[in-house]
């Protein structure tokens, strides 16, 4: 995963909070 926010590594298209 490129950016790990508060979600799991299954959601890769997430904004960096």
Curated annotation (Swiss-Prot):
Main EC class the enzyme belongs to: hydrolase
pH dependency: Optimum pH is 7.5.
Superkingdom of source: Bacteria
GO terms of molecular function: hydrolase activity, acting on glycosyl bonds
Biological process (GO), any one: division septum assembly
Post-translational modification: The N-terminus is blocked.
Entry EC number(s): 3.2.1.-
Claim: Ligase is one of the keywords in the record: no
Keyword Cell cycle appears in the UniProt entry: yes
Record key words, sorted: Antimicrobial, Bacteriolytic enzyme, Cell cycle, Cell division, Cell wall biogenesis/degradation, Glycosidase, Hydrolase, Septation
Functional description taken from the UniProt entry: Hydrolyzes the cell walls of mycobacteria. May play an important role in cell wall growth and cell separation.
Subunit structure: Monomer.
Protein name: 38 kDa autolysin
Organism: Mycolicibacterium phlei (Mycobacterium phlei)
């Amino acid at each position: 995963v490129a950016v790990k926010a508060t979600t799991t590594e299954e959601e890769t298209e997430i904004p960096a909070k």
